[in-house]
Amino acid sequence: MTAAAGSAALLLGAFVFQALGYAPCAMCIWQRYPHAIAIGMGALLLFALPILPILIIGALSALSTSALGVFHTGVERGWWEGPTSCTGSGLDVSQMSVSELLPSASSNASNLVLCSEVVWEFLTLSMASWNAILSGVLACLWLVAIARHQKVRWHGVADVS
């Protein structure tokens, strides 16, 4: 439940930044989907359902958004190329319109952000970097929950420490 609450906090933070005018890029949006799944898995834990599959899906969700955050950080830092759909890499963009550069974006050009652009940093880390780190911590929480669940299944004793 703590890991799901952490995903909810990260997702809420992303929406707050967006409300404050920090428009997300496509890769930022991609990183939100696994958080939504993790939140859903946390909600399912409230019901008497098989716990292990829920914990595994929660862990995979946190790991996937962390991996996306690492990839996005690499794109922002120029360590590797990002998707051409949101970085414009490999194209002569000098003669292209906004709708040609980002066809899936809204017509409001002031809200368009390239995935290779860092729009906010704290302690030299971008939002994507923070998502990668914090989601990695959440993945560890999910994995600890899996280990504890398995320990109870195997030994019949809950670890209350």
Predicted regions: what they are:
Residues M1-A5, F47-S66, C140:
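Interfacial segments of alpha-helical transmembrane regions
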Residues L125-R153:
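Transmembrane alpha-helical segments in integral membrane proteins
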